[in-house]
Design a protein with these regions (language model features):
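The feature marks the mature, well-folded catalytic cores of soluble enzymes
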Residues: 1-220
Length: 220
């Protein structure tokens, strides 16, 4: 069987590509918070989706297989145990400071259908979506953060799918992203490579992984 990853040239014939269709994570951007998310403008979702769909259709018309990030992740989380492990890792990697809110977010996400859960992690979890029982001894830093709308930040940069991972030969790098706003993106690729049936059985080499010390990102 052919290797699921085999990239030896930047100019060779493209057979398969991994994409992310812009989604609700773009609508979560606001002028007040877009700098934190590494944006300098708020994109128009419908136009972004129209342009993306035209691009994806062009790829298919040229006999290129198009894979989608959210669906691959959902397919990789094939057991209840994997699903919960993924949710816990995603939430804890978001640097939630309070145990009481962390547990509530984990339970909220874990109760969803797998694909819906993946998409919700991508689009972010707002504070008004989750019922959190606040502690009686609420500290000053809790009050200071009250005006921030998210428990779990959206991931509006996901459509740059070449940044968190790069195919090299029959393996790949799963990159440690430099900016905190993007560091959780690499977790998606980690679970796909380890657990998706298309990839897991091949024991794909990971040349560089996100726990490593130095940040690495894809380029234009």
């Amino acid at each position: 069987m052919d290797q699921p990853i085999q990239v030896n040239s930047e100019i060779g014939r493209l057979k398969t590509v991994l994409l992310h269709r812009p989604g609700e994570e773009l609508e979560a951007l606001t002028p007040d918070h877009m700098e934190r998310m590494l944006f300098d403008d708020v994109p128009y979702l419908k136009e972004a989706q129209r342009e993306h769909d035209a691009f994806a259709d062009t790829l298919r018309e040229n006999n290129i297989e198009v894979l989608y990030l959210d669906k691959l992740v959902a397919e990789a989380l094939s057991t209840v145990e994997l699903k919960w492990r993924f949710v816990i890792e995603m939430v804890r990697s978001s640097k939630q400071e309070d145990t009481y809110s962390t547990d509530a977010i984990i339970n909220y996400l874990g109760s969803m259908d797998t694909l819906a859960m993946v998409r919700k992690i991508m689009s972010g979890v707002k504070k008004d979506e989750v019922k959190v029982i606040e502690p009686a001894d609420k500290q000053l830093h809790h009050f200071l953060a009250d005006d921030y709308p998210f428990y779990l930040d959206p991931m509006p940069n996901l459509y740059f799918t070449r940044d968190p991972a790069a195919s090299i030969g029959n393996g790949l790098t799963i990159n440690k992203m430099h900016w905190p706003a993007r560091r959780r993106e690499a977790i998606f690729m980690d679970y796909i490579v380890k657990h998706h049936p298309r990839f897991a059985q091949h024991k794909i080499p990971v040349w560089y992984n996100r726990p490593n010390r130095f940040s690495v990102e894809g380029g234009d």
